[in-house]
């Protein structure tokens, strides 16, 4: 009965999907997603960027592009029958884009059926690397986009509010992960109460939740803990200015281990660069002002750390 109440499916992905998120807006997720995409494409890999910051998409601006005439909403509304039909060029060899800039009002609130169709089709895309740039917040849509990835990359800045929002994102992600993985109704109900923190049910750490689950289903808590260990989550600290800022990454990784019982690998930090904002205001392509900066070199180093062939044991499906 070691795996009672859990669903497990073998992964069949032939691509490597990376989701880039973090909970708070303004931390530089889009910049880092675009830059990693450029680095991977420069090494000869076929790369696709997906702007899933639904409702406030801006990834096209990092390539000096006007809002593309086709975008993700055309696939969502079935104006385009295939997701490949909304892919556009970025002007960089080997690097393509699915833009969200044309998205209609309400796109941020995808129905379950719409989300399932998008996620399942993303998994079938034949690119070596797929980078999904997520919007801020902890909605189910954002969490589910993060969970289909082989590797999730959290982007935060040294500010306390950004760090706090990252922890909140991780906690929400784990509860969502368990909610979608566990079939046992009583355990699902327990998780739901913990998320809402109703009826006096509050879990300060994932270990409190696992202990409560053990009371309902002996041994299931241990099994869930082993499944949590399969999550591949990374962390990048953006906009760093001091050595103290750079030290935050390792500290956050330790906190994640202590309170969430998961391993988060600190990939590195990215230096503050005032020229980035200047370039964006002038609608200049990222490559025109960024490739020789210290920040870009740091992102290039990060891109080299995430390129091994990741393969999840758990594969979420949205049928």
Regions found by a protein language model. Name each.
Residues 1-26, 35, 39-46, 81-85:
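Extreme N-terminal, non-catalytic leader segments
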Residues 29:
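Conserved lysine of the Walker
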Residues 32:
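Hydrophobic positions on the alpha1 helix immediately C-terminal to the Walker A/P-loop
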Residues 52-128, 197-204, 214-217, 226-229, ...:
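P-loop/Walker-type NTP enzyme "switch/lid" segment
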Residues 54-56, 102-105, 137-138, 159-162, ...:
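Conserved nucleotide-binding/hydrolysis micro-motifs of P-loop NTPases
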Residues 135-265:
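Conserved catalytic-core segment of NTP-binding enzymes
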Residues 260, 271-282:
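Nucleotide-binding motor/catalytic cores of P-loop/tubulin-like NTPases across gene-expression machines
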Residues 281-295:
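C-terminal boundary of histidine-terminating zinc-finger modules
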């Amino acid at each position: 009965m070691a795996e009672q109440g859990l669903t497990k499916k073998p992964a069949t992905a032939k691509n490597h999907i990376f989701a880039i998120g973090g909970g708070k807006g303004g931390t530089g997720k889009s910049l880092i997603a675009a830059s990693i995409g450029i680095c991977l494409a420069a090494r000869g890999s076929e790369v696709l960027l997906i702007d899933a910051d639904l409702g406030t998409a801006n990834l096209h601006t990092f390539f000096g592009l006007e809002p593309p005439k086709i975008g993700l909403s055309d696939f969502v509304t079935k104006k385009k029958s295939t997701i490949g039909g909304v892919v556009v060029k970025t002007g960089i060899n080997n690097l393509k884009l699915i833009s969200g800039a044309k998205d209609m009002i309400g796109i941020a609130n995808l129905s379950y059926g719409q989300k399932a169709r998008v996620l399942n089709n993303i998994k079938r895309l034949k690119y070596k690397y797929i980078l999904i740039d997520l919007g801020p917040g902890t909605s189910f849509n954002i969490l589910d986009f993060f969970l289909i990835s082989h590797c999730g990359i959290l982007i935060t800045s040294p500010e306390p509010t950004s760090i706090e929002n990252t922890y909140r994102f991780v906690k929400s992600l784990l509860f969502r992960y368990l909610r979608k993985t566990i079939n046992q109704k009583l355990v699902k109900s327990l998780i739901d109460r913990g998320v809402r923190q109703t009826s006096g049910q509050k879990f300060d750490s994932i270990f409190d939740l696992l202990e409560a689950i053990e009371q309902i289903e002996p041994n299931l808590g241990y099994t869930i803990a082993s499944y949590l260990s399969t999550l591949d989550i990374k962390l990048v600290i953006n906009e760093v200015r001091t050595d103290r800022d750079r030290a935050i990454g390792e500290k956050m990784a330790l906190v994640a281990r202590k309170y969430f019982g998961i391993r988060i690998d600190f990939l590195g930090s990215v230096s503050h660069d005032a020229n980035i904002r200047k370039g964006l205001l002038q609608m200049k392509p990222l490559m025109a002002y960024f490739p020789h900066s210290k920040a870009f070199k740091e992102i290039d180093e990060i891109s080299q750390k995430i390129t091994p062939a990741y393969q999840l044991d758990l594969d979420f499906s949205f049928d």
